[in-house]
């Protein structure tokens, strides 16, 4: 009973340190498997436009099938020094890909990193309302899934017929996502090899190509995600295009900003 009271008290204390959205994310985080801090954190702080980003708290999250994910948890504090966002950080190569874009200012680079971290974390923590809010009502959405198959020989390349593509409206995509959230014990996304290009029109509109490893309790795949996102208002990103393909097409390469 004493330990339960201690935990409950600590959660109460945590609420006073967070904004409403920050506390909602915290509650989802502590329900994400069995979480624990795995090493002494070496925090790094970055101030941008009055907000402070704190990286990174190393944590592991274990699920019932012994599947474990290791994440660097990132905190964003608002101008009142309250935790406004919790996210799973990008790995160092992915961050470096964006930070090395020296033609962009620090604000742009930080907005892009924060967006990608919020995006991947929203799927892991099943933040349905947030995901619904960032997709444009008329977004172009193409999903893909790798079908189960038996290769004739070990190591044989997968045929194109083994991948199913589906074009969906936003409402169709969100309905399917809701089912996935309800039926999956866990979801985890890993990003790598990202390329970001700025559109020549529309202000802060970016095309993001990124390699995605998708893990869930019932399905997994690796492929290439493309997002065309409007970041003119960094607090309210709008995704206009979301596509997925399992590998680079030998004739056309990856879907990118030039296709739209």
Language-model features: locations:
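Short, small-residue-biased leader/transition segments that mark boundaries at the very start
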Residues: 2-7
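Post-signal-peptide N-terminal segment of Sec-exported extracytoplasmic proteins
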Residues: 9-15
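Extracytoplasmic/secreted proteins, especially bacterial periplasmic and envelope-associated proteins
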Residues: 13, 21-28, 107, 111-114, ...
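Sec-exported extracytoplasmic/periplasmic mature domains
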Residues: 16-19, 120-124, 136, 140, ...
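Surface-exposed, charged secondary-structure patches
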Residues: 22-76, 155-219
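Juxtamembrane and targeting peptides
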Residues: 49-126, 130-164
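Short beta-strand edge/turn micro-motifs at domain boundaries
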Residues: 63-108, 201-209, 213-260
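Loop/turn elements at helix/coil->beta-strand transitions in domains of secreted/extracellular proteins
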Residues: 126-129, 187, 235-237
């Amino acid at each position: 009973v004493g330990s339960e009271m201690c935990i409950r008290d600590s959660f109460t204390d945590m609420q006073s340190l967070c904004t409403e959205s920050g506390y909602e994310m915290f509650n989802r985080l502590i329900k994400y498997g069995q979480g624990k801090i795995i090493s002494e954190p070496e925090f790094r702080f970055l101030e941008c436009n009055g907000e402070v980003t704190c990286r990174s708290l190393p944590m592991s999250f274990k699920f019932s099938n012994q599947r474990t994910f290791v994440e660097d948890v990132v905190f964003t504090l608002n101008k009142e020094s309250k935790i406004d966002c919790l996210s799973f950080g990008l790995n160092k190569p992915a961050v470096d890909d964006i930070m090395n874009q020296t033609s962009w200012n620090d604000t742009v680079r930080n907005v892009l990193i924060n967006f990608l971290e919020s995006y991947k974390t929203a799927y892991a923590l099943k933040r349905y309302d947030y995901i619904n809010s960032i997709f444009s009502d008329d977004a172009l959405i193409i999903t893909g899934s790798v079908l189960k198959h038996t290769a004739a020989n070990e190591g044989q390349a997968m045929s194109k017929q083994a991948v199913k593509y589906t074009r969906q409206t936003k409402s169709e995509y969100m309905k399917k996502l809701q089912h996935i959230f309800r039926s999956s014990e866990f979801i985890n996304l890993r990003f790598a090899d990202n390329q970001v290009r700025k559109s020549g029109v529309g202000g802060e509109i970016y095309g993001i190509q990124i390699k995605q490893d998708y893990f869930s309790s019932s399905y997994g795949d690796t492929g290439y995600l493309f997002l065309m996102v409007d970041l003119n208002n960094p607090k309210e990103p709008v995704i206009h295009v979301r596509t997925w393909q399992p590998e680079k097409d030998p004739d056309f390469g990856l879907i990118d900003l030039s296709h739209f």
